Amino acid sequence: MRNFELLPKMENPRIVIKKQKRTLEVFDGEKLIKTYAVALGFAPAGDKEKQGDGRTPEGEFYIFTKNDKSKFYLSLGVSYPNSEDARRGLEAKIITQTEYNAIVKAVDAKKAPPQNTYLGGDIYIHGGGAGKADWTWGCVALDNANVKELFDRIPVGTSVKIEP
């Protein structure tokens, strides 16, 4: 789904990832600007529950970092786990109250949530190819040229919605 126009500068960028359609949409406010093909985690059905499950998380997140030294070309860090993931993890006794508190505090401050709990972490939008098969450990992969456009135009703090 490579469009030949580069992603323009935007006033109010946001990202919507539709897992069933295998797409990443970039909006400026309510206006759809561009759609990209993506690959997901190797077990994409359902919401991410824990580290190593191969699922791509669902919910409301934000970009908390950008990495130009990624082993998958370039990457944008997605703020998984969010407060809802933390609540479910606490109820299921997957994480401790201390870990829950740290996640909620980070999310409330729009910082990087802890990436080392049993909920998992290190969810990125990165290069390496959309291809025909889902191959990541839960990340969202694009072709390198497409992730370069996102990397250049999407700032830290941009909202990311991941839908089933």
Question: Where do the model's predicted regions map?
Answer:
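A generic fold-level signal
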Residues: 9-10, 19, 55, 71, ...
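N-terminal post-signal-peptidase region of extra-cytosolic proteins
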Residues: 1-14, 20, 40-65, 144-148
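A generic structural signal for short beta-strands and their flanking turns/coil linkers
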Residues: 34, 57-61, 72-74, 121
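Exported/periplasmic cell-wall-interacting domains
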Residues: 67-164
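A short, compositionally biased
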Residues: 17-23, 155
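A structural detector for beta-sheet-dominated domains
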Residues: 18, 39-41, 79, 163
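Core beta-strand residues in small-molecule sensory/regulatory alpha/beta domains
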Residues: 25-27
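Short Gly/aromatic-enriched secondary-structure transition segments
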Residues: 31-42
